[in-house]
UniProtKB/Swiss-Prot annotation:
<keyword id="KW-0862">Zinc</keyword>
<feature type="zinc finger region" description="CCHC-type 6">
    <location>
        <begin position="143"/>
        <end position="160"/>
    </location>
</feature>
<dbReference type="GO" id="GO:0005737">
    <property type="term" value="C:cytoplasm"/>
</dbReference>
<dbReference type="GO" id="GO:0002192">
    <property type="term" value="P:IRES-dependent translational initiation of linear mRNA"/>
</dbReference>
<feature type="zinc finger region" description="CCHC-type 2">
    <location>
        <begin position="55"/>
        <end position="72"/>
    </location>
</feature>
<feature type="zinc finger region" description="CCHC-type 3">
    <location>
        <begin position="75"/>
        <end position="92"/>
    </location>
</feature>
<dbReference type="GO" id="GO:0008270">
    <property type="term" value="F:zinc ion binding"/>
</dbReference>
<keyword id="KW-0597">Phosphoprotein</keyword>
<keyword id="KW-0479">Metal-binding</keyword>
<dbReference type="Pfam" id="PF00098">
    <property type="entry name" value="zf-CCHC"/>
</dbReference>
<comment type="subunit">
    <text>Associates with active polyribosomes.</text>
</comment>
<keyword id="KW-0677">Repeat</keyword>
<dbReference type="GO" id="GO:0003729">
    <property type="term" value="F:mRNA binding"/>
</dbReference>
<dbReference type="GO" id="GO:0005783">
    <property type="term" value="C:endoplasmic reticulum"/>
</dbReference>
<feature type="zinc finger region" description="CCHC-type 5">
    <location>
        <begin position="123"/>
        <end position="140"/>
    </location>
</feature>
<dbReference type="GO" id="GO:2000767">
    <property type="term" value="P:positive regulation of cytoplasmic translation"/>
</dbReference>
<keyword id="KW-0963">Cytoplasm</keyword>
């Protein structure tokens, strides 16, 4: 095993999450779920390891734990947030609830609350260097060359020495 491996639970090098002494699950599928029974979709960290306040349970629709550790017996509907049924059996009108901000009326992909890998913060755009949006949502339409730093062309079109590799 490479010493450059970084643990997704504690963010320290030298081991994988499945071997982490922090514990707390993760299982064979590791962070992000997937193969072998997985550990769910845990993202980011709070500097000291796992970020419990952002773990979202898809059984009760609350933050702080995953479904495998859910204290509620009954399942909660993602659509209306009601207890005792799931979204496919919901009789409420289709009014989506955002999993990021927990507000109704939009999906997470359209959420106005900016989030980066460390959680809800004021993100910055690498294209225009302004805060409040990410590059894919950047209002700036001009191209910026990563070789010379000037706008109006891309690196592959750069005529300056050292601009094109």
């Amino acid at each position: 095993m490479s010493m450059s491996a970084t643990c997704y639970k504690c963010n320290r090098p030298g081991h994988f999450a499945r071997d982490c002494s922090l514990g707390g699950g993760g299982g064979p599928g590791g962070v992000g779920g997937g193969g072998g029974g997985g550990g769910g979709g845990m993202r980011g960290n709070d500097g000291g390891g796992m970020r419990r306040n952002r773990e979202k349970c898809y059984k009760c629709n609350q933050f702080g734990h995953f479904a495998r550790a859910c204290p509620e017996e009954a399942e909660r509907c993602y659509r209306c947030n009601g207890i005792g049924h799931i979204s496919k059996d919901c009789t409420q009108a289709d009014n989506p609830t955002c999993y990021r901000c927990n507000k109704t009326g939009h999906w997470v992909r359209n959420c106005p609350e900016a989030v980066n890998e460390r959680g809800p913060t004021n993100v910055s755009c690498y294209k225009c260097n302004r805060t409040g949006h990410i590059s894919k949502n950047c209002p700036e339409t001009s191209k910026t060359c990563y070789g010379c730093g000037k706008s109006g062309h891309l690196r592959r079109e750069c005529d300056e020495k050292g601009g094109r590799n």
